[in-house]
Amino acid sequence: MKLFLIIFLFAPVYLYSQQNYCISNIYIKGNTITKSKVITRELPFKQGDTIRADKLEGVLKMAKNNLLNLSLFNFVYVKKSINPDNSSNLDINIDVEERWFIWPLIDIKFEDRNLSNWIRTSDSKRITLDAGFRIYNLWGLNHTVSASYKFGYHKGFRLGYENISIGQTRSHVLGFVVFGQFSKTENFISLFNSPVYNRSVNEFAVKKISADINYTYRPQIRVSHTVMIKYENINISDTILKLNPKYWGNSDTTRNSLSLNYIFISDQRDNYQYPLEGYLIKGELRGYVNTDYTVRYGQLRTNLQYYLPLSDKWNVCANLTSGISMKNVQAYIFDRAIGYEDATLRGYEFYVNDGQQFVTFNPTLKYNILPTKVSVLNFLSFLPKFRKIHFTIYGKAFFDIGYSHHSYPNISNFLSNKFLCSGGVGLDLITYYNINLSIDYSFNQLKEHGFFFSIKSLLF
């Protein structure tokens, strides 16, 4: 009798899990500019595929996330319907709301390692303005072209044609960038765990021109291999070498160099802008050599991220970043570790910790204070691409630890070769056009504490 009851209760569940649906049609609307093939090649299924019933919702969720991660759409809706001609067939309906793709480039950059450090110094001269244009989704193919002129703290230019997909499956992607930067200020050493700058009055401290080409192979939608080759010509003032003879490894004021980088990424996060579930594995090999082969440098860098929902409101995540480098000469420019790029410790925004090897670990507990809201801004009725806005707010608590090893540290850098820790609480505001605003109240083991601010993915 018990066996019969168990079979009676669970047989429908088993039969449902074994049911298969065939994708008979894929309908797309809302893509006024974006080509349909750009959308279909990001889907984890294609017309004619068979999907198990118990896997269907997860597959549709992945399709939605893949399309949002293109950064081409503010909203994506993926729905299913039973084909009227056959109950085992499904029609997939995809409705997208495109972003604005053509931007006059008016970009204000606060020239510091982070916004909090710039606010502390309040140096109005440390601002660079970019003026030009940037076009996303060129020809509806998700290509990006940009041209800009820099003035202010840095002067220079940038020309780029990037994200050029080759083939129907977007398995091969190319990018080209030409870049020039001319600055009268340069960070030439770290003292007391803070970057020290030399400001030249009459001449440029650093003049840099570079050209790079990168190629990406995507064997899967969320897995990529990238190779980048860069040629660079740099001229520095002799003052830099007088202030720090070990600035870049030799006594030349002019250098031509080649860089070769390889990057592997497996990005299984649900949403690239503000992930809450999934993981990221990133590994990077960097190689650098000047053209007379007297200065050589290599680095292995890794980044592991993991995101886990604990409930509808609570999430936990962890970020582990590490790097190990080798070089044949002592050079300050190759020793930048904690406080640069993605190796950060919240609460140490005002400090850097140089070294040849480093590791940082950043676990965070998050709580969804305000679920995602969608509002229509009627006063922007003349700008339909900006009128509909979404936003959500998360509270968070965090505890960071890190360590950087320096083989020949400056005696003034009191954080060298020490385990560091910090903690705090904060708020994150996430909204459209990939805008993330963060306010943290952090403290560190130096008994310092305060508010810190950051802005990611600015609108322009």
Regions found by a protein language model. Name each.
Residues S257-K388:
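C-terminal outer-membrane beta-barrel translocator/porin domains of Gram-negative envelope proteins
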Residues Q19-G175, S251-L276, Q357, S404-N410, ...:
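Outer-membrane beta-barrel initiation region
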Residues F179-S183, E232-I234, E284-N290, G323-K327, ...:
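Short glycine-rich beta-strand segments
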Residues K246-W248, N256, I333-T344, Y403-L415, ...:
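Solvent-exposed, glycine/polar-rich loop segments of beta-barrel outer-membrane systems
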